[in-house]
From Swiss-Prot:
Top EC group: transferase
Record's cofactor remark: Binds 1 Mg(2+) ion per subunit.
Keyword tags: DNA-directed RNA polymerase, Magnesium, Metal-binding, Nucleotidyltransferase, Transcription, Transferase, Zinc
Protein name: DNA-directed RNA polymerase subunit beta'
Function of the protein: DNA-dependent RNA polymerase catalyzes the transcription of DNA into RNA using the four ribonucleoside triphosphates as substrates.
Residues involved in Zn(2+) 1 binding: C71, C73, C86, C89
Entry GO CC: DNA-directed RNA polymerase complex
InterPro entries given in the database record: DNA-dir_RpoC_beta_prime, DNA-dir_RpoC_beta_prime_bact, RNA_pol_asu, RNA_pol_N, RNA_pol_Rpb1_1, RNA_pol_Rpb1_3, RNA_pol_Rpb1_3_sf, RNA_pol_Rpb1_4
Enzyme Commission (EC) number: 2.7.7.6
Species assigned in the record: Actinobacillus succinogenes (strain ATCC 55618 / DSM 22257 / CCUG 43843 / 130Z)
């Protein structure tokens, strides 16, 4: 028996114990060594006997027996003949599964180039030979000869000759030279290459050349040559002489009934190759005419191409059904390929799926499992129990009992299932909370019951959703399911650290209803001795739920020892709140309950409970809230009737007023005072404002009601209108939706996002007429179409994010860096969007945090900032804190715990082995899908808020202006002429309270440093047009303003007023393209006026679409507008702008018209202009080299001649390019930019994501650097290398006292970063499989199996989570084994030598311990 076990073990020997996977080119000998025989015939199987043909594609002699332990002719059967080779049919008697692993080969009659190395761009063969791909193809496909050995002729090696040229040459020189065609020619050239010599030549060229393109080309070639030298690949192996044949069971041929066969396409492709190869062999034996042989060789080349990668060159070979055949390359790439279909995701056993329904009586850690399903899933366990209990003697008997469903089976099932967790999964699994573990409770029926509180995490509802059940089998799996995946362990969301087990809908409504108060309710003013009595009073009808009463409340407060002490107070509260207090856990303060609890407040309750009392209490509390909420929601009897949608009387007045305003604008438009665009914008603003007013009136009307209090006086209180309660509590619906029910629907959007200017003045209660309905269908349908498209987009974004971040794991506790990023609160306008405490909570301080204005340390360095520290920060009004960040972490492969900070889902410092990369990717990707699915909920209603046109300050304080330039107009007001002016209001402590951006042309009412009081308007501007402001006074002189060429005159029919419209460059006639319309200012004599303090003439270039209302020669003052540029009309902002925006940011795409930034600091001047461009010069003040850049003339510049700029300043407006920010402002700035821009999109949608997740992705985008100075290291200049590798090399060089390698960080988009990863397995399974594998094979790459994906693919535990320890142990064992091996190698002679040295050290007391250690190290 023992032998049998050992034998089976030996049979299933897989190379388990490897640490690296290497890929390379296969030499012909290697292919022969894999092979078990040559396939000589194209036959497959005999159609009558279904037996494989000998020497054919399915030959049993080559590939192994068709039946287990049985040869083909049937002479040897059974295990006893194991290993015998039958002398009759030549088949080895063994298991049939060897047909899955034994390969064959085909000896090709003529060499064939491997299409991947030929056609996969850049062509490797082409690069190596330094020949264009077209030429190589002409040789390979027998159109030209190539000179291999020129001999004494005047031909050159590698020269192409046509048929005629070849014949001429042959006549002239006879056999002096050698020229061939086809793959053999290419092969012999490759074989003759001297790689080392080529490398040397190239290195010399690289030193001598100055042109950038040449350098790039040489570097590329040099890298390829070096790769060949280092990897030990031979170039001629890119041309094959032997073709491997896939094992037959991987390309099956299955007989169908009716004599037909279902076959894999590969068999067809192989058959083609074998047929052509055999024909070629015969032709060569017969010494057929050259032209026929040549044709056959070409066909062989084409058939091998098709087998390897069909359709890569020429037309794809198609099968009988006109579909292209699936080649070997197609087998591995794409979603259906080997990598993604079989290696990264597999179907699993022991699983089932069913519809879900509500389980309101379950505990949080339970789910209801239908008995039928449980019986099927736990079958083997039941069999085992039945046998061990003696109810069944054999498995067969047990099976019968289970199928009969005997009574005993149900008892055993209940026992088996007890405390055996199961996993529930709802697709799409967008984040890790999409799979959670529960304890099953057996139920009747066929639907799985799910606890309502976990619905938010699964994003599940009960409208027909299905969920899958999986059974963890091994003890370890059960342990992990219970300890890590149990729903009770996942109370907080990993995306933002807020509770995700939060009541919603009915529960919220019930709790809200309980905790509302009412004026003059029944039993108001009662004195009750405890909540129990309050409940009694409510149940017996002596008091209403909402009545205001006095009750003795006992709270439990922690004392100094950390034990709870009771404290009893008489509190003013309501009966309902007292009843709710009965379920509160010990240690919660009553004031959290003594308020009207909406969804946010309940979430805060659970959060507080978690932070104060821990997980167990929170879970029980959440369950209790749910039961109570359901009960009281039912008691409240809330329902929605049409009369609940109360339409305010004022609505019609507001609408009439708005219509009046619109009519006025229309009149102005007809008199030519405003343009079409301005009219459109103003009309939309009017309606948006009207809509807001209607909504406000409606909400006031709906939310309050007047009642008579106990004294008999009228008093206002919150209304008990059902619709209002649902929205106010956060149970369902929002103000925007109620506005559509009872206010007015408002403006609608067209599918392209522009707004239809006719609003829908009706609401859903009044009903829409045909036109209104039609207008609203527009936007609503777009919403539905978008949803379908964007789900896919968002899923793809998540996939790219996961792929780029998959190998980022916490690998050590502290990297010891002092770097970090500075956090300060985000202030937009007058309100603090994100307070500092939210930004630094759960981060580690990078430096001591000092009390403002003193040297007192508030928070020491390396402290994890938790809620208590946040309170200290708030109390001391700290303005900014430097915190550790993933981006600045110094760990080489991975991140350290201190730089990451708190594990958001657990609330403590993150553990080692946590896969933070994947968590980050999921946290960013998950709301993407939710948001994309949420486009159409407001029915396409355009939420265009009225544009701001002034700054009204909200706090008292002092004004500070940054980046400001202005002129004073003749009214004495300041007019801004700078474009990125920022206005901040600071309080007496110097803390920023408000922050505004002011546009060009703003009129300021206050100067820098002026005191302001709340409510003052300090600046105003026209939001719809941008003026061009004159900085000097004088007379207008038109330059290049030619009617019909550069401008068109618009005369208004009604008023006769004319204005000049500047045309866009693209729309002008050819003659006008080079003209630059401008307004020059001259004095009365017609001389140029200079701008103050410079020698630049005051000349203002007019961009396209600008409107000039002045006439030539008009007189103007300082600060007057010369022209107006209408601003584009507003589109709707929803995540549509959002998801593509996020993708663009993470892909680090350059925007269409990027902002131009100053490359160096210095003084701006303008040089000689060319046809369409201006020459911008920046002269550094410290006397460096002047920088010059050509800028298209149509770009509006933010700088004037003679102005001082800092490196990285804006020169021309536009979207900033992250690459520029990185280059000019550094890593911190680019991190901040990407984090803020991504957060902006999510914040608009009200989604909370912690910054550190985005930082994790940014770290991965910054993984690579470009070498700028390599000195004598292993790198090449201009090479792209992982920063971690450069750091390792630099540490070594520092120790040796050599100069450090210099490099420049590079920002890669996530797709590029994924493909540029060190691991080729990970990259190949992501995208562009062919390209990645070709590159890796040529370079002979090694995959160290560091990331998660590579390990999943080779079938190991991932090096994260519980697999982290496993991998660490493996590494340790490997290290020890190596050390042991080294130790064994010591011989007696070595030992003697060491002894002598040690004696020497012992004799010489001056030698230090360090030397001994050094010696030990060297050994």
């Amino acid at each position: 028996m023992k032998d049998l076990v050992n034998f089976l073990k030996a049979q299933s020997k897989t190379a388990e114990d490897f640490d690296v996977i290497k890929i390379g080119l296969a030499s012909p000998d290697m292919i022969r060594s894999w092979s078990f025989g040559e396939v000589k015939k194209p036959e497959t199987i005999n159609y009558r006997t279904f037996k494989p043909e000998r020497d054919g594609l399915f030959c049993a002699r080559i590939f192994g027996p068709v039946k287990d332990y049985e040869c083909l002719c049937g002479k040897y059967k059974r295990l006893k003949h194991r290993g015998v080779i039958c002398e009759k049919c030549g088949v080895e008697v063994t298991q049939t599964k060897v047909r899955r692993e034994r390969m064959g080969h085909i000896e090709l009659a003529s060499p064939v180039a491997h299409i991947w190395f030929l056609k996969s761009l850049p062509s490797r063969i082409g690069l190596l030979l330094d020949m264009p791909l077209r030429d190589i193809e002409r040789v390979l496909y027998f159109e030209s000869y190539i000179v291999i050995e020129p001999g004494m002729t005047d031909l050159e090696k590698g020269q192409l000759l046509t048929e005629e040229q070849y014949l001429d040459a042959e006549e002239r020189w006879a056999d002096e030279f050698e020229a061939k065609m086809g793959a053999e020619a290419i092969q012999s050239i490759l074989r003759d290459m001297d790689l080392e010599h080529e490398c040397e030549v190239l290195r010399e060229e690289l030193q001598e050349t100055n042109s950038e393109t040449k350098r790039k080309k040489i570097t590329k070639r040099l890298k390829l040559l070096e790769a060949f030298i280092q990897s030990g690949n031979k170039p001629e192996w890119m041309v094959m002489t032997v073709l491997p044949v896939l094992p037959p069971d991987l390309r099956p041929l299955v007989p169908l009934d009716g004599g037909r066969f279902a076959t894999s396409d590969l068999n067809d492709l192989y058959r083609r190759v074998i047929n052509r190869n055999n024909r070629l062999k015969r032709l060569l034996d017969l010494v057929a005419p050259d032209i026929i042989v040549r044709n056959e060789k070409r066909m062989l080349q084409e058939s091998v191409d098709a087998l390897l990668d069909n359709g890569r060159r020429g037309r794809a070979i198609t099968g009988s059904n006109r579909r292209p055949l699936k080649s070997l390359a197609d087998m591995i790439k794409g979603k259906q390929g080997r990598f993604r279909q079989n290696l990264l995701g597999k179907r699993v056993d022991y699983s089932g799926r069913s519809v879900i329904t509500v389980g309101p009586y379950l505990h949080l850690h339970q789910c209801g499992l239908p008995k039928k399903m449980a019986l099927e899933l736990f079958r083997p366990f039941i069999y085992a129990k039945l046998e061990s209990r003696g109810y069944a003697t054999t498995i067969k008997a047990a099976k019968k009992m289970v199928e009969r469903e005997d009574v005993i089976v149900w008892d055993i099932l209940a026992e088996v299932i007890r405390e055996h967790p199961i996993l529930l999964n709802r697709a799409p699994t967008l984040h890790r909370l999409g799979i959670q573990a529960f304890e099953p409770i057996l139920i009747e029926g066929k639907a799985i019951q799910l606890h309502p509180l976990v619905c938010a995490a699964f994003n599940a509802d009960f409208d027909g959703d299905q969920m899958a059940v999986h059974v963890p089998l091994t003890l370890e799996a059960q342990l992990e399911a219970r300890a890590l995946m149990m729903s009770t362990n996942n109370i907080l969301s990993p995306a933002n650290g807020d509770p995700i087990i939060v009541p919603s809908q009915d529960v919220v409504l019930g709790i809200y209803y309980m905790t509302r108060d009412k004026v003059n309710g029944k039993g108001e003013g009662m004195l009750l001795q405890d909540p129990r009595e309050a409940e009694k009073a409510y149940r017996t009808g002596r008091a209403e739920l909402h009545s205001r009463v006095k009750i003795r409340i006992t709270e439990y407060v922690k004392n100094a020892e950390g034990e709870f002490e009771p404290q009893t107070n008489l509190v003013d509260t309501t009966v309902g709140r007292a009843i709710l207090w009965m379920i509160a856990p010990k240690g919660m303060p009553f004031n959290l309950f003594n308020q009207t609890l909406g969804k946010k407040a309940i979430s805060k309750l659970i959060n507080e409970c978690y932070r104060r009392l821990g997980m167990k209490e929170s879970v029980m509390f959440a369950d209790q809230i749910m039961y109570t909420g359901f009960a009281y929601a039912a008691r409240s009897g809330s329902s929605v009737g049409i009369d609940d949608m109360v339409i305010p009387e004022k609505k019609y007045e507001i609408i009439a007023a708005a219509e009046q305003e619109v009519a006025e604008i229309q009149e102005q438009f007809q008199s030519g005072l405003v343009t079409v665009g301005e009219r459109y914008n103003k009309v939309i603003d009017i309606w948006a404002a009207a809509n807001e007013r209607v909504a406000k009136v409606m909400m006031e009307n709906l939310s309050t009601e007047e009642v008579i209090n106990r004294e008999g006086n009228p008093e206002k209180q919150s209304s008990f209108n059902s619709i209002f309660m649902m929205a106010d509590s956060g149970a369902r619906g929002s103000a925007a939706q109620i506005r559509q029910l009872a206010g007015m629907r408002g403006l609608m959007a067209r599918p392209d996002g522009s707004i239809i200017e006719t609003p829908i003045t009706a609401n859903f209660r009044e009903g829409l007429n045909v036109l209104q309905y039609f207008i609203s269908t527009h936007g609503a349908r777009k919403g539905l179409a978008d949803t379908a498209l964007k789900t896919a987009n968002s899923g793809y974004l998540t996939r790219r994010l996961v792929d780029v971040a998959q190998d980022l794991v916490i690998v050590e506790d502290d990297c010891g860096t002092h770097e970090g990023i500075v956090m300060s609160p985000l202030i937009e306008g007058g309100d603090e969007k994100v307070p500092l405490r939210e930004l630094v909570l759960g981060r580690v301080a990078a430096e001591d945090v000092l009390k403002p204005g003193t040297e007192e340390v508030l928070i020491p360095r390396n402290t994890l900032i938790d809620e208590q520290w946040c309170n200290i920060i708030d109390e001391n009004s700290v303005d900014s804190i430097k915190v550790r960040s993933v981006v600045t972490c110094d760990t080489d492969f991975g991140v350290c715990a201190k730089c990451y900070g708190r594990d958001l889902a657990r609330g403590h410092l993150i553990n080692q082995g946590e896969a933070v990369g994947v968590i980050a990717a999921q946290s960013i990707g998950e709301p993407g899908t939710q948001l994309t699915m949420r486009t159409f909920h407001i029915g396409g209603a355009a939420s265009a808020a009225a544009k701001e046109s002034s700054v009204q300050v909200k706090n008292n304080g002092t004004i500070r202006l940054a980046n400001v330039k202005f002129v004073t107009n003749n009214e004495g007001k300041l007019v801004l002429t700078s474009r990125n002016t920022e206005l901040t209001v600071i309080d007496a402590f110097g803390r920023t309270k408000e922050h505004y951006k002011l546009p060009y042309g703003t009129t300021l009412n206050k100067a820098d440093g002026a005191e302001v009081t709340a409510g003052e308007i300090v600046a105003n501007w026209d939001p719809h047009t941008m003026p061009v402001i004159s900085e000097v006074a004088g007379f207008v002189k038109f330059v290049d303003i030619v009617d019909g060429l550069t401008v068109s005159r618009q005369t208004d029919e009604l008023t006769g007023l004319s204005s000049i419209l500047v045309q866009d460059v693209g729309e002008r006639a050819t003659a006008g393209k080079d003209l630059r319309p401008a307004i020059k200012l001259v004095d009365a004599q017609g001389n140029d006026i200079l701008i103050e303090g410079t020698d630049v003439a005051a000349q203002y270039f007019l961009p396209g679409k600008a409107i000039v209302t002045l006439d030539d020669g008009a007189e103007i003052n300082v600060g007057d507008p010369l022209a107006r540029i209408p601003q584009e009309s507003v589109g709707t902002k929803d995540i549509t702008g959002g998801l593509p925006r996020v993708a663009d940011l993470f892909e680090a795409r350059k925007p269409k018209e990027p902002a131009i930034l100053a490359e160096i600091s210095g003084i701006v001047s303008f040089g000689k202009e060319t046809k369409g461009k201006r020459r911008l010069l920046i002269t550094p003040t410290d006397g460096g080299e002047t920088y010059e850049e050509m800028i298209p003339k149509w770009r509006q510049l933010n700088v004037f001649e003679g102005e001082m700029v800092q490196r990285g300043d804006l020169i021309s407006d536009g979207a900033e390019t992250p690459h520029d920010i990185l280059r000019l402002r550094g890593v911190h700035a680019v991190t901040e930019y990407i984090v803020n821009e991504v957060q902006e999109v999510y914040r608009l949608q009200g989604v909370k994501i912690n910054d550190k997740h985005i930082e994790v992705i940014v770290r991965q985008m910054l993984r690579k650097a470009i070498i700028t100075n390599a000195y004598d290291s292993e790198f090449l200049e201009g090479e792209q290398v992982e920063v971690a590798r450069i750091k390792i090399v630099n540490r070594k060089r520092e120790a040796e006292g050599k100069p450090l390698v210099e490099f420049e960080r590079e920002l890669l988009g996530i797709t590029k970063a994924s493909l540029a990863t060190e691991s080729f397995i990970s990259a190949a399974s992501f995208q562009e499989t062919t390209r990645v594998l070709t590159e890796a094979a040529v370079a002979g790459k090694r995959d160290e199996l560091r990331g998660l994906k590579e390990n999943v693919i080779v079938g190991r535990l991932i090096p994260a989570g519980t697999g982290f320890a496993y991998h660490q142990n493996r590494a340790k064992n490997r290290h020890n084994a190596l050390a042991a091996e080294q130790a064994v190698k010591f011989s007696a002679a070595d030992e003697a030598e060491i002894d002598a040295e040690f004696n020497m050290i012992a004799d010489d007391p001056t030698s230090s311990l360090a030397e001994m250690l050094n010696m030990a190290d060297e050994e």
